[in-house]
Amino acid sequence: MAQKKGGGSTRNGRDSESKRLGVKVFGGQAINAGGIIIRQRGTRVHAGDNVGVGKDHTLFALVDGHVQFAVKGPAKKQQVSVVPAA
């Protein structure tokens, strides 16, 4: 005879790793070319001047400069640009 009851099963015990999304460089801060500005799912924020878009919708700087956020158009879309360092 077993001296212990069988250990039951559980439906818990798994969790996905966080993806570290969000703004990495804020408005007014300096950034180098190639630096990541925002990691996002979909285009929550759109690319403006001197900003590139990666295949996972990551926004990155194409030139050295300062980050600038703006709200554009009638749909009030957020847009991020990089103002080149003079």
UniProtKB/Swiss-Prot annotation:
Keyword Nucleus set for record: no
Keywords, ordered alphabetically: Ribonucleoprotein, Ribosomal protein
GO CC annotations on file: cytosolic large ribosomal subunit
Coiled-coil portions: none
Region entry Disordered, spans: 1-21
One Gene Ontology term from the biological process aspect of the record: translation
Ranges of compositional bias, category Gly residues: 1-10
Gene3D superfamilies in the record: 2.40.50.100
InterPro entries linked: Ribosomal_bL27, Ribosomal_bL27_CS
Pfam families membership: Ribosomal_L27
Keyword Ribonucleoprotein: yes
A single MF term (Gene Ontology): structural constituent of ribosome
Family the entry assigns: Belongs to the bacterial ribosomal protein bL27 family.
Protein name per UniProt: Large ribosomal subunit protein bL27
Species whose genome carries this gene: Cupriavidus necator (strain ATCC 17699 / DSM 428 / KCTC 22496 / NCIMB 10442 / H16 / Stanier 337) (Ralstonia eutropha)
Highest classification ranks of the organism: Bacteria, Pseudomonadati, Pseudomonadota, Betaproteobacteria, Burkholderiales
